[in-house]
Design a protein with these regions (language model features):
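N-terminal secretory/targeting leader peptides
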Residues: 2-3, 7-20, 25-123, 133-134, ...
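An N-terminal domain-start capping segment
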Residues: 128-132
């Protein structure tokens, strides 16, 4: 009996000693190393810093068990190659705007940006509670991708120009950097539209390769240096009223994760979505003050005639995209029905209150 007890104690001591020589996380479970590719330049505001923060959050919430290495554009794949890289398993996840892939998968436009479409809050409501997420999953499933919303900057600006634009005629021959469905709207107005990656916009403007460019809003645009290369800053960004950025995850990887890890990533993405919008609003307030203080810069609205023309062509473009295939039609119908309902509610709530506040504080 004493011999058996002694042997058991020796065995337990050996096990404890071995465990003590390992880092704490390794005792519990192995570290899972993942790769994230993005469509943004290193340290670019606001997109890349949000992607980096999301990766850190997932690592922290998992107690280091999920370790994500982030590769900005061109470090592993190009800015517009992230979707295909994750689909093929070259990378585990991407951080990008799905409007970059709308020519490949038309329905994806509705989960990113639609001219004169939903704002950030409205889009989040449709995705979370209006059937949008289920449709998004259906759209991405054939490409082996699980999509989640992880960023939104809110209503964007209309862009920087090297001259005033007062009529549709001013867009004819204009070389303009713009992605997504808005690009097709301007193309129909006679503009020469290019989808230049964000990191190349300044060079293109300085060299004269383009005459105008939209990026995001005051905070991001100042960080990029757009205020140093153009004088006319137009609003509103009719083309991107609330562009959502996607965390696209390889579905084979996703399906192999424990339910707790799927929930962890979903919660982290949702938290970053909320934080990114709050951060962008706060930083845009400060950046707009800087721009207003620069007398060289003219902050101007697109006039009513231009807005009407943008709207007319946007309706054409969205209708044509919706007719591309049955699934895109299904997505478009859901999107437009939700938009109609939330616009009705918004007139009584958000718009109604803001109009009242303007009157009260004027």
């Amino acid at each position: 009996m004493k011999t058996r007890r002694r042997d058991a104690l020796i065995g337990a001591a050996a096990t404890a000693a071995a465990a003590g020589s390992l880092p704490a996380p390794a005792i519990a479970q192995r570290v899972k190393e993942l790769t994230m590719v993005t469509s943004w330049s290193e340290n670019s505001i606001p997109y890349q810093i949000s992607a980096d923060r999301l990766a850190r959050s997932i690592g922290a919430i998992s107690d280091g068990r999920l370790k994500i290495t982030v590769y900005p554009q061109n470090k592993l794949v190009g800015a517009f190659e992230t979707f295909d890289a994750v689909s093929a398993g070259v990378a585990d996840m991407y951080h990008s705007g799905d409007n970059y892939f709308g020519s490949k998968v038309p329905a994806l436009n509705f989960f990113s940006e639609v001219p004169f479409g939903m704002t950030a809050d409205e889009l989040s409501s449709w995705i979370a509670f209006g059937g949008g997420q289920e449709l998004w999953d259906e759209v991405d499933a054939p490409f082996n991708i699980k999509p989640l919303s992880c960023f939104n900057e809110g209503v964007q600006m209309g862009g920087w120009f090297n001259k005033e634009v007062n009529s549709a005629a001013d867009f004819k021959g204009l070389r303009y950097r713009m992605p997504g469905l808005g690009a097709e709207v301007l193309r129909r107005m006679g503009a020469t539209v290019v989808t230049t990656p964000g990191g190349e916009i300044i060079t293109a403007l300085k060299s004269g390769a383009i005459d105008a460019a939209e990026w995001v809003g005051p905070w991001a645009d100042i960080a990029m240096g757009l205020d140093k290369v153009a004088d006319y800053y137009y609003y509103p960004g009719f083309h991107e009223p609330g562009t959502s950025v996607t965390l696209g995850i390889n579905k084979t990887l996703w399906d192999g994760l424990a339910a707790s890890d799927q929930a962890l990533i979903t919660v982290a993405a949702g938290a970053e979505l909320t934080k990114s919008l709050a951060e962008s609003n706060a930083e845009n307030v400060k950046a707009l003050t800087v721009l207003r203080a620069d007398k060289r810069i003219k902050i101007l609205p697109f006039n009513d005639d231009l807005i009407r023309e943008f709207a007319r062509l946007s309706k054409e473009v969205v209708a044509e995209i919706a007719a591309k295939d049955p699934l895109t039609r299904k997505v478009a119908d859901s999107y437009m029905a939700f938009l109609a309902g939330i616009m009705d509610w918004g007139e009584l709530s958000e718009t109604g209150y803001r109009n009242t506040r303007r009157l009260a504080l004027s």
